[in-house]
Amino acid sequence: MNHPETKEKKWRIFGALPANIVSLGWVSLFTDMSSEMIYPLLPLILTSVVGAGTTFVGLVEGIAEATASLLKLFSGWFSDRLGKRKTLVVAGYTLSAMARPLRAATTAGWHLLLVGFLDRVGKGIRTSPRDALLSDSVRREETGKAFGFQRAMGHAGAVAGPLIAFFLLTFLTAD
C-alpha cells in the first residue's frame, strides 16, 4: 500500500499535508467533539434518568470499549486483505455518526447499551484502517507530522466537546 513515488504527486493542502490527512483530521475533530459532549453525562443519564445501577454503568462502558478493542484487530487485518482502507474508515465513521443521535431516543438502560455498542463497533471498524491510511498517505519521514496533526485535531475536539455541552446545558436549558 505504501507507494513513495506517488506520494509526491498527491494533492496537498497548503503544501504541507495530503488531503487525506487533513480530511481525517477534521473528521476526528468533529467525531471526538460529538463523543465528548455526551460521554461525561452518560453515567448521570444512566443512573438518574434511566434508573440503572452503577454496575450497569460499568457494564455499558466495558462492553463498548472491549468491542472497539477487539474489532481493531480484525479491521486492521481486513483492511490489509481488502486493500480498500477508505471504505472501512468511511463505514466506521458512518456507523458511529448514525448511532450517536439514537441516544436521545433511549428510554431504557439496554437501549443505551445497544447504542453504545453500535458506536464502538464503528470505532473498532475505522481505527486501524484509518491509521494505516494515514501512514499510506505520506512519505515515511512525514508519518509523525501526519499522525500528530490527526491526533491534535482529535484532542481539540475532545476539549471543545465538553465545553460546548457545558454552554448548551448552562445557557439553553430552563432549569
Language-model regions: role of each:
Residues 9-68:
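Helix-loop boundary and gating motifs at the non-cytosolic
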Residues 44-49, 160-175:
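Transmembrane alpha-helix termini and helix-breaking/packing motifs in multi-pass membrane transporters
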Residues 65-73, 158-159:
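Residue-level signature of mid-helix packing/kink "hotspots" within the transmembrane helices
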Residues 71-83, 169:
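Helix-to-loop junctions at the C-terminal end of transmembrane segments
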Residues 87-101:
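Structural signature of the two symmetry-related core transmembrane helices
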Residues 102-115:
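Helix-loop junctions at membrane interfaces in 12-TM secondary transporters
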Residues 115-156:
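Cytoplasmic helix-loop-helix junction between adjacent transmembrane helices
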